[in-house]
Amino acid sequence: MAYMTPYPVRPGGPEDIDFLWEMLYEATQHSSLSDPAISRYLNGWGRPGDAAVVALDPDDGQKIGAAWYRCYPSDDCGFGFVGAWIPEIAIAVVPNRRGSGVGRACLQKLVDTARSQGFEALSLSTRCDNHAAIRLYERHGFTRLSGTDSQQPSWTMKAGLSTIVARQ
């Protein structure tokens, strides 16, 4: 049975870029957005293959979460890089809505978008101590591929789009 979200999730557009930057700041646990390793996730947004979704509060229409992906070349890749034709995703939710299903709703809509664009898999990177995110990703078919150094331990995860299903 498909997950029915109480949160409207719509495709992201150029009008959402400032909110995506806010969400990147949240997703990176308040890392400097001027760091090229971080800013690559949104710099030059709107190139071919970029896609985003935005979750809205059902009562007032305020933006409460977002998810997006983009493909990277192997010589300028993100933390969750798996391959040049596998988009890397990022998901973030405003602090007061975490744990309420917003991230799950964004992930499912982003998966639908990736399928419609012909992608076969998605990848991501998440901190090893972000247990809620890891549970969400694993429930949706992502598997752990590798970890990184001990100063900023993280998991690279990947899921084939044929294995990702909506979960309750």
What is each residue range found by the language model?
Residues 29-58:
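Active-site rim helix/loop that mediates acceptor-substrate recognition in acyltransferases
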Residues 50-54, 66, 90, 123, ...:
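Short hydrophobic/aromatic beta-strand element in the GNAT-like acyltransferase core
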Residues 56, 88-99, 126-127:
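A short, internal acetyl-CoA/4′-phosphopantetheine-binding micro-motif in the GNAT/acyltransferase core
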Residues 58-90:
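Conserved acyl-donor/pantetheine-binding loop and adjacent beta-alpha core of acyl/acetyltransferases
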Residues 6-20:
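A short beta-loop-alpha structural element at the N-terminal edge
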Residues 99-116, 135-139:
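Conserved acetyl-CoA-binding loop-helix of GNAT-fold acetyltransferases
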Residues 83-87, 120-123, 127-134, 138-140, ...:
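C-terminal "cap" of GNAT-fold acetyltransferases
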